[in-house]
UniProtKB/Swiss-Prot annotation:
GO biological process, alphabetically ordered: catabolic process
InterPro entries with a match to the protein in the record: Fumarylacetoacetase-like_C (IPR011234), Fumarylacetoacetase_C_sf (IPR036663)
Binding site for a divalent metal cation: E143, E145, D174
GO molecular function, one term: metal ion binding
Record entry for activity regulation: Activated by Mn(2+). Inhibited by Ni(2+), Cd(2+), Co(2+) or Cu(2+).
Source organism of the structure: Aquipseudomonas alcaligenes
Tagged with keyword Transport: no
Family per record: Belongs to the FAH family.
Protein known as: Maleylpyruvate hydrolase
Inducing factors: Induced by 3-hydroxybenzoate.
Keyword check for Hydrolase: yes
Length: 287
């Protein structure tokens, strides 16, 4: 199932070029008192939510997908975990381009040496919200990635069981301000983590390591790769992340970008696509 959030926090199921409004299904979520939990309640109770949705779909109001404003399908992740260089060809382009590596040795190490990093939750936005470019005196780059949404609490999960802890998948855009500062700092301005266009539940993608992905800017193909080229695949990423962090429902792991990263400017439009997930268009604007 393809689950989306749209407009003023409405809940929808995507069916072709339409969205079925199933916001009523949110009634299955429990109410909370302060302090609020450190996980996403919708993802935590996804099974109950899906069961309720099934009872609503037949009579749900239908809206054209083109007429809705898509928000991030995960509203409250406990953390956003990001993978640095996780494609060999991306490592090669980083080594070759001083505008990317800025002469910092740690920026030219692949994931097995550099580990993972965190992005600020406040950087999260949906496809319909677009990207507000920060620090336009610097180069701002796009990076398309497969995003993994954790479905249940996980700690020290072996790779052979790791997919059991996944709720589903999205397209992720990891925007980056180029410079010498630490990755987390340069990748965490507001709207620099785009998640969307919706959450595709795990049952619809049995082989996340075999997905074709691409990104175009103003119609020009910039990135085109397959998740089979990941250095650490989805299973290994969940294993690796859970060996350092306790993963909670709604935590997001963005798996790293392939080669072809490049700059964007206000007025540009990015079209990102991942096989079996869908496509999303993201507008670039000034802050």
């Amino acid at each position: 199932m393809k689950i989306c959030r749209f407009n003023e926090n409405r809940l929808g199921v995507v069916d072709g070029d339409e969205v079925l409004d199933v916001t009523e299904a949110l009634s299955v979520l429990p109410s909370y008192e302060y302090p609020l939990p450190g996980y996403d309640p919708l993802i935590k109770h996804l099974d109950a939510l899906l069961a309720r949705i099934e009872t609503l779909i037949k009579d749900a109001p239908r809206i054209l997908l083109a007429d809705v404003r898509l928000l991030s399908p995960v509203a409250n992740p406990g953390k956003i975990i990001a993978a640095p260089i996780n494609y060999t060809r991306h490592l090669q382009e980083v080594l070759a381009d001083s505008a990317i590596n800025n002469g910092v040795a740690s920026f030219t190490q692949h994931i097995k040496k550099s580990g993972l990093f965190l992005k600020a939750n406040s950087s999260l936005a949906g496809a319909g919200e677009g990207v507000a470019l920060s620090h336009q005196d610097r180069r701002n780059d796009h990076e398309v990635e497969l995003a993994i949404v954790i479905g249940k609490t996980a700690r020290n999960v072996p790779r052979e069981k790791s997919l059991e802890y996944v709720a589903g998948y999205c397209i992720g855009i990891d925007m980056t301000v180029r410079g010498p500062e630490e990755r987390s700092f340069r990748k965490s301005p507001d709207s620099y983590t785009i998640l969307g266009p919706w959450l595709v539940t795990r049952d619809e993608i049995d082989s996340p390591g075999e997905l074709q992905m691409s990104l175009k800017v103003n119609g020009e193909v910039r990135q085109n790769a397959n998740t089979s080229d990941l250095i650490l695949g989805v299973e290994e990423l969940v294993e690796f992340a859970s060996s350092f962090y306790t993963l909670h429902p709604g935590d997001v792991i963005i798996s790293g970008t392939p080669e072809g990263v490049g700059p964007v400017n206000p007025g540009d439009a990015m079209l990102a696509e991942i096989e079996r997930i869908g496509t999303m268009t993201i507008a670039i604007r000034s802050v």
